Amino acid sequence: MNEFFSVEPNYYLVLAAVLFTIGAAGVLVRRNAIVLFMCVELMLNAANLTLVTFSRINGDLNGQIMAFFVMVVAAAEVVVGLAIIMAIYRTRRSASVDDANLLKY
């Protein structure tokens, strides 16, 4: 019964590649800072999925531990990034990344 529910690791790697591609396309195309952060998070989740998949293939926990640390760093990145976005929005009334260079004035 367990073999019926098991999924090949190749499918996880393909899913991770698709998620990373969607995130990279969003980073390249979009100008809204909040959408950029969401796309970067999507790319980090794709990297985490790849780490966990290779951890499962090799049978060790190192990839899962690394994915955990990536999630912790990503959470800290979101906190700092959203604080910067809020500062930009308060001064410029826009969340566009084009206004980010105006924050120094």
From Swiss-Prot:
Places the protein is found: Cell membrane
Catalytic reactions of this protein: a quinone + NADH + 5 H(+)(in) = a quinol + NAD(+) + 4 H(+)(out)
GO terms under cellular component: NADH dehydrogenase complex; plasma membrane
Stretches that traverse the bilayer: 9-29, 34-54, 65-85
Catalytic EC class: translocase
Gene3D superfamilies: 1.10.287.3510
A molecular function GO annotation: NADH:ubiquinone reductase (non-electrogenic) activity
GO biological process: ATP synthesis coupled electron transport
Membrane topology summary: Multi-pass membrane protein
Pfam family of the protein (one): Oxidored_q2
Keywords for the protein's UniProt record, in alphabetical order: Cell membrane, Membrane, NAD, Quinone, Translocase, Transmembrane, Transmembrane helix, Transport
This enzyme's EC code(s): 7.1.1.-
Assembly information from the UniProt record: NDH-1 is composed of 14 different subunits. Subunits NuoA, H, J, K, L, M, N constitute the membrane sector of the complex.
Function: NDH-1 shuttles electrons from NADH, via FMN and iron-sulfur (Fe-S) centers, to quinones in the respiratory chain. The immediate electron acceptor for the enzyme in this species is believed to be a menaquinone. Couples the redox reaction to proton translocation (for every two electrons transferred, four hydrogen ions are translocated across the cytoplasmic membrane), and thus conserves the redox energy in a proton gradient.
NCBIfam families: PRK05715.1-2, PRK05715.1-3, PRK05715.1-5
Family label: Belongs to the complex I subunit 4L family.
Protein name: NADH-quinone oxidoreductase subunit K
Protein species of origin: Salinispora tropica (strain ATCC BAA-916 / DSM 44818 / JCM 13857 / NBRC 105044 / CNB-440)
